[in-house]
UniProtKB/Swiss-Prot annotation:
Coiled coil among keywords: yes
The protein's name: THO complex subunit 7 homolog
Protein function: Component of the THO subcomplex of the TREX complex which is thought to couple mRNA transcription, processing and nuclear export, and which specifically associates with spliced mRNA and not with unspliced pre-mRNA. Required for efficient export of polyadenylated RNA. Plays a key structural role in the oligomerization of the THO-DDX39B complex.
Assembly notes: Component of the THO subcomplex, which is composed of thoc1, thoc2, thoc3, thoc5, thoc6 and thoc7. Component of the transcription/export (TREX) complex at least composed of alyref/thoc4, ddx39b, sarnp/cip29, chtop and the THO subcomplex.
Keywords associated with the record: Coiled coil, Cytoplasm, mRNA processing, mRNA splicing, mRNA transport, Nucleus, RNA-binding, Transport
Designated gene of the protein: thoc7
The family this protein is said to belong to: Belongs to the THOC7 family.
Length: 202
């Protein structure tokens, strides 16, 4: 009766251990059971029952080892995949920094254009105070053309800057979604590891 109780305890421990850290203990328990089976006097029925239990434990060890190896290989492939993703992210971030630097230069250029336009406006007001001079009118027309060109350049710079801001926002959103996906994958793997004892129990 005591032997049956010990076997039940061993079986429960094997079921609770599942994959991972309990494998070493499962093997140690199997070795102890084998030693006990070799040096104890059992009736044929008890000996056969003990033998079948040891074979079941051995099969569990082999199954756990195969499953662990499979998970290990899958993790290696996932790590290679993640490394590729991280490399792409790093390249995207570097590209984003370059675009930001370019946008800053465009902003400085737009500020200079604005300053020049203000100076041109001030000069135009002075010129308008002398409309009777033919040469002054010619200069005013030239200034108007320059103002139109500068205004067009400024609009183009502002449009390009707005586009860069939108592209950078999309990039940051993509990076955040990817990080969330990776965290979800890690959580799912953790949940699968916790649920594996229940699967072995079934």
């Amino acid at each position: 009766m005591g032997s049956i109780t010990d076997d039940e305890v061993i079986r429960k421990r094997l079921l609770i251990d599942g994959d991972g850290a309990g494998d070493d203990r499962r093997i140690n328990v199997l070795m102890k059971s084998f030693t006990k089976w070799c040096h104890s006097s059992f009736s044929p029925e008890e000996g056969m029952s003990q033998y079948q239990r040891m074979m079941m434990s051995l099969a569990q060890c082999e199954f756990s080892m195969g499953k662990t190896l499979l998970v290990y290989n899958m993790n290696l492939k996932e790590m290679e995949n993640y490394e590729g993703i991280y490399t792409d992210i790093e390249k995207s971030i570097a590209s984003a920094h370059e675009k930001i630097a370019e946008c800053k230069k465009e902003i400085q250029r737009a500020k200079r254009i604005r300053k020049n336009r203000q100076e041109y406006d001030a000069l135009a007001r002075v010129i308008k105070q002398h409309p009777d001079r033919h040469e002054t009118l010619k200069q005013l027309e030239a200034l108007d053309k320059d103002l139109q060109q500068l205004s067009h350049i400024k609009e183009n710079v502002e449009d390009k800057l707005e586009l860069r801001k939108k592209q950078f926002h999309v990039l940051l959103t993509t990076i955040q979604e990817l990080q969330q996906t990776l965290e979800n994958d890690e959580k799912m793997e953790s949940d699968d590891t916790q649920d594996s004892p229940m699967e072995n129990g079934d």
